[in-house]
Amino acid sequence: MTPKEIRELAPAELPTKIRELREQLLQLKLRKQTGQVEKTHELRSLRKDIARLETALTASKKKAAA
């Protein structure tokens, strides 16, 4: 997910998107435990995307409070 895509998301959509990515991460972790994942780099990219979205969510909350 690119920074531009993150900025284009509405603040109300951020928690939903974070939840979706966390579910994907959970599924990927479970598949990794069973040895079904070939692209292990996806775990890292999902974690980073979640962090980026959480950062954007925090920034939007601070902006709304100010």
From Swiss-Prot:
A GO biological-process term: translation
InterPro entries linked: Ribosomal_uL29, Ribosomal_uL29_CS, Ribosomal_uL29_sf
PROSITE patterns: RIBOSOMAL_L29
Keywords: Ribonucleoprotein, Ribosomal protein
Record GO terms (molecular function): structural constituent of ribosome
Superkingdom of source: Bacteria
GO terms under cellular component: ribonucleoprotein complex; ribosome
Coiled coil: none
UniProt similarity note: Belongs to the universal ribosomal protein uL29 family.
Name under which the protein is recorded: Large ribosomal subunit protein uL29
Chain's gene name: rpmC
